[in-house]
């Protein structure tokens, strides 16, 4: 810098050559200074690393165990995959529903216990958290012209909380509307579902039951997968309560009143519907003793999947 300040006293004919020389020396000095600073920084970093209480040359720790789907999600997806492979399409709908779609159009009488404040979660007058995904059946039948075949997976809500019930649970509704649909078609779909989901040779039986939205109605049992002998018979166990059978869902032929409430002619169209609780099916498939285990998020339990 001092030399550059004295350039004014240098003769004009030598000023150019001396200026170039000064610039060259300046760049060389500044470069050497920068290199030295980098070397000092590296030396300081190396000293810190050598003094560290750990060896950076050691191999990295094993990666954390990979995540996996929750048992409820896995079972739901398995059920949906089976039913979609049988020709059903997925249909979605709201969890906050009007009373008429959740109860009225499904044939529930006004004094049915399910409509009580003690059994359902009401938000405001005429609105509640859906108690089943059958509300999607009403919405689909109101907005789609038959024939149709849908499944409706989703969360549902009821005032229930014990070892086998949860106030929030997941359900899958399956329904088909076409001409000349009979109980034989329903039983065929259920048998194929049980075969694919629970395993080859799983027997299915239907027991008469009552539901407001189907006629006739039935409860569906499958042969207990936990006590099956080599010859196909069941020995009876704690899961099936020594009966050899486990209830998994309710079903039936869609009631004519339901068709009429959706503007569909029951003289021309018929259909079936069935609904299952995903948690219930998961309990059956995996022998889970308490439904609350599915919601406690205990890593020891979830890792078993």
Which residue stretches match the model-derived regions?
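TRNA-recognition modules of translation machinery and tRNA-sensing kinases, especially anticodon-binding
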Residues: 6, 13-305
